[in-house]
């Protein structure tokens, strides 16, 4: 009698546990996969976000290039002034006209004696003490369409981050009166500038006052050394 009484609850407990397990399996549902429409919606949202962020990304890139150009321009002017301090004259003869091809100035300031491209410093003729006043890097790709942020070994010019050679202007008359390449009081200072050397970048559009760009500085994307 005692054995039967003890055994009955055990059998009932086992049956109850088995029933609970079976019931849990019956209520388990398989995971539903994404439908094609849902995937298309997600892709569309991602495309919209990229479209919104891309202009901001490009703006950040452009600003970084402008900042680099500004630093390069200041270094160019400082190098020209350092040359004047060392030699008592400027590195190249000029009549205050913009130097569109800056290779002559750069050869001299870099103490490069290369006999090429009409280098005025060939055989160290100008920078006789062979002092390196500026030492920018060479361009990573030396092709006409890809020159950026450095000196081209081919033509000797110093290119801005936008792929255009830097413009330089030197007070060749030694009268401390530099004609401003931009219209007076349009954001780039007064008419004549009381300064010995200036430099500027034509900016992203590649246009400066001397090659079809606007002379109103406020309406341009140019970068200048003196402001």
Predicted features by range, described:
Residues 1-34:
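N-terminal leader/signal peptides at the extreme start of proteins
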Residues 9-10, 18, 41, 52, ...:
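N-terminal regions of proteins, emphasizing targeting and processing segments when present
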Residues 14, 19-22, 58, 95, ...:
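Residue-level recognition of conserved structural "scaffold" positions that shape functional pockets
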Residues 30-60, 65, 69:
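N-terminal single-pass transmembrane signal-anchor helix
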Residues 66, 70-227:
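N-terminal pilin/flagellin-like segments and related low-complexity appendage regions
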């Amino acid at each position: 009698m005692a054995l039967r009484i003890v055994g009955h609850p055990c059998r009932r407990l086992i049956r109850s546990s088995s029933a609970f397990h079976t019931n849990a399996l019956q209520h388990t549902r398989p995971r539903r996969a994404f439908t094609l429409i849902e995937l298309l919606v997600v892709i569309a949202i991602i495309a919209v976000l990229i479209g919104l962020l891309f202009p901001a990304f490009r703006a950040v890139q452009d600003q970084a290039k402008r900042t680099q150009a500004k630093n390069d321009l200041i270094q160019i002017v400082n190098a020209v002034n350092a040359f004047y301090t060392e030699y008592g004259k400027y590195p190249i003869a000029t009549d205050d006209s913009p130097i569109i091809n800056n290779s002559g100035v750069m050869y001299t300031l870099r103490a490069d004696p290369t006999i090429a491209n009409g280098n005025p410093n060939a055989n160290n003729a100008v920078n006789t003490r062979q002092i390196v006043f500026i030492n920018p890097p060479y361009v990573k790709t030396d092709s006409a369409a890809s020159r950026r942020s450095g000196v081209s070994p081919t033509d000797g010019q110093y290119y801005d981050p936008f792929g255009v050679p830097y413009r330089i202007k030197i007070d060749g008359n030694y009268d401390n009166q530099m004609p401003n390449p931009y219209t007076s009081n349009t954001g780039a200072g007064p008419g004549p500038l009381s300064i010995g050397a200036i430099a500027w970048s034509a900016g992203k559009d590649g246009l400066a006052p001397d090659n079809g760009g606007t002379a109103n500085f406020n309406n341009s994307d140019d970068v200048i050394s003196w402001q």
